[in-house]
Every structure is written in C-alpha cells, then in structure tokens.
Curated annotation (Swiss-Prot):
Ribosomal protein recorded as keyword: yes
Organism: Rhodococcus jostii (strain RHA1)
Gene: rpmG2
Xref: HAMAP family: Ribosomal_bL33
Keyword Ribosomal protein applies: yes
UniProt xrefs under Pfam families: Ribosomal_L33
Single Gene Ontology MF annotation: structural constituent of ribosome
Protein name: Large ribosomal subunit protein bL33B
GO cellular component terms, A-Z: cytosolic large ribosomal subunit
GO annotation, biological process: translation
Keywords (A to Z) from UniProt: Ribonucleoprotein, Ribosomal protein
SUPFAM superfamilies, per the entry: Zn-binding ribosomal proteins (SSF57829)
Length: 55
C-alpha cells in the first residue's frame, strides 16, 4: 500500500497571483519529476493564473 503513495503523491498547487488560494491534486512522479505548474482559475483574483507546486 505504501508504493501507491510514493508513485502518485498528493500535492498542493499555490496561486502565483499572491492571493493564497490553493488547489489539491495528485501527480505522477514518473512522468513529472519536477515541480508541477498548471494554469487554473483563481476565484479570489477572478482570473486564470499559474499555480505552482509547493512542498
């Protein structure tokens, strides 16, 4: 059961707009070994911005 968590860990995506809004998602470490960056909607800033993975 521990292998499942190692391959696809849960990560937080924090808004780069500085609003403090976060999304929670899973990522595959084999396909994305670097920090994840996704463009998503920030409801606090009311626009689409980049969300970066935080540790």
């Amino acid at each position: 059961m521990a292998a499942r968590n190692e391959i696809r860990p849960i990560v937080k995506l924090k808004s780069t707009a500085g609003t403090g809004y976060t999304y929670v998602t899973r990522k595959n470490r084999r396909n994305d070994p670097d920090r994840l960056v996704m463009k998503k909607y920030d409801p606090v800033g009311r626009k689409h911005v980049d969300f970066r993975e935080e540790k």
